[in-house]
Amino acid sequence: MTSPQAVEFLDEFEVIVVGAGHAGCEAALASARMGCSTLLLTLNLDKIAWQPCNPAVGAPAKSQLTHEVDALGGEIGKMADRTYLQKRLLNHSRGPAVWALRAQTDKREYAAVMKTIVENQGNLTVREGMVTDLVLGDNDEVVGVQTYFGVAFRCQAVILTTGTFLGGRIWVGDKSMPAGRAGEFAAEGLTETLNQLGFETGRLKTGTPARVDKRSADFSVMEPQPPDQQVRWFSFDPAVWIEREQMNCYITRTTPETHQLIQDNLHLSPVYGGWVDAKGPRYCPSIEDKIVRFADKASHQIFIEPEGRDIPELYIQGFSTGLPEALQLRMLRSLPGLEHCAMLRPAYAVEYDYLPATQCYPTLMTKRIEGLFCAGQINGTTGYEEAAAQGIVAGINAARRVNQQEMLIFPRAESYIGTLIDDLCTKDLREPYRMLTGRSEYRLLLRSDNADQRLTPLGREVGLIDDRRWHLFTRKQATITAEKERLHATRLKERDPAAQAIVQTTGEKIKGSITLSDLLRRPKFHYCDLQQHGLGIETLERSERESVEIEIKYAGYIQRQQRQIEQVSRQEQRKLPENIDYASIETLSMEAREKLAKVRPLTVGQASRIGGVNPSDINALLFYLETLARLSPVS
């Protein structure tokens, strides 16, 4: 670290963001839109908001984060809506708490559009530079940054969003080089500065699969994965709802030849060869990890996904590896449909430095240095959506600190963003953290459809929701409220023609009369059925219809979940049997079984604070204890 007397500042900003990935862009845009002069520093102006791994946004829990960032006034949801190649709603056959929108995006278009947005944002300056040092004031508060080439910038707040670049090193087999990702140099020096300031740092690992030329693939032997015909949107802003031509993805599978190749050459992998001991992401394992951890599985699904409309590269999802390049081609050619493929880019593993986020407050400001914030992979997370969520929070709080306003803490009961940050700041997590629906005990309350209802008023309060968006929001909420009231108040008599038609269609009787809201509570009856019988409002938007139906149909489940939450709170001091066999409790996640068996907590409360043990696991554990109590002989 450097004192302000030892440097000459080239320029002055209120907030400086270090790194222009998905966390950095959200942080910089939030800060600038809230009126702070902001500098966004990046190692490469041509790789702003680059998607170095899978060019996709959304999926379970990640889509909820994306909707929430948009509801606050962020950009990632709009970006996915502007640049999608394919959209699909996952888990639609299940309850709305786990519905998950996923978009395959055009990698180059995504980066180009975001570059235009940040370059044209008022109050925001974008330039290249590698930050290696922090400039601190007399009270150990941040007052500036210094770059590798000795240029210094004064500021009141710094947000570190360094991704995989901090001490980054990529591996292919036993060959390695310093790099944040292929073709881009690593950020050196900043880790040493942070260590000198007393921060604990660690190493994590991730990886990306090879890219294949689509002209060399035989799609006729693969299973097509078509898009949904009815397009859905991440953003609550209709201004970005522009339908585009969609593309297919495809599915192939590993073969016995694939598995044999990997098993015979495990010793050549950076991890199994012993050259890398950093922890990788549990929920996005390399193909060699899958073969080892799931040795009983004869085959694994592999998804073949386009990286863009006008580029020939295919992303081979589920096939990341650190094995040698020559072996990678043999592995790829063992997959049906890729027997004659041309590999354009090899897969690689990347290890990098991170700061365990227990060193941050829930505002994402560090505890050691006033005015220093961290967001994204530097906090130990994995995924663009997790990064974007932290980025907008750090940007909001950095701006509020500059403006001498109270910084915000997002309660876990009110958003997935709050759940994410609470987990990061309170649990000692030593592997890359991915958001899962099971990590939230409030997931029935924290649905994608009501993200605007939960967070847009806050976005308006902090200055990220403009008058147009606010008008759209208030009109939508008024429409939903009015329609719910109409459905509760309107009764249908059993002799009405519409009632008789409904009985004939559904096979369920109507005795005397029934409210339209009670009709909607029936499991197989939906708002579209009301419309079919002339009982709905045709002018309602799909999002309004779905919100009305969900809030009426699942009201009882929501109340039950709230009671479960209260039960967990009461059960904190409940003792756990010393001889409990966690491996046999199938309702626990695999991660929870492993962590509980290793730590062997004494109480339910202690179990709930183990990293990787989610609230849903605690509910499963309580249910198991109740079952044990019922089956035990009465003494």
From Swiss-Prot:
InterPro entries: FAD/NAD-bd_sf (IPR036188), GIDA_C_N (IPR049312), MnmG (IPR004416), MnmG-rel (IPR002218), MnmG-rel_CS (IPR020595), MnmG_C (IPR026904), MnmG_C_subdom (IPR047001), MnmG_C_subdom_sf (IPR044920). Pfam families: GIDA, GIDA_C_1st, SAM_GIDA_C. Gene3D superfamilies: FAD/NAD(P)-binding domain (3.50.50.60), GidA associated domain, C-terminal subdomain (1.10.150.570), tRNA uridine 5-carboxymethylaminomethyl modification enzyme MnmG/GidA (1.10.10.1800). FAD binds at residues 19-24. GO terms for cellular component: cytoplasm. One of its GO terms (biological process) is tRNA wobble uridine modification. Transmembrane segments: none annotated. NAD-binding protein involved in the addition of a carboxymethylaminomethyl (cmnm) group at the wobble position (U34) of certain tRNAs, forming tRNA-cmnm(5)s(2)U34. Homodimer. Heterotetramer of two MnmE and two MnmG subunits. Belongs to the MnmG family. This is tRNA uridine 5-carboxymethylaminomethyl modification enzyme MnmG. It comes from Acaryochloris marina (strain MBIC 11017). The lineage of its organism: Bacteria, Bacillati, Cyanobacteriota, Cyanophyceae, Acaryochloridales. The gene is mnmG.
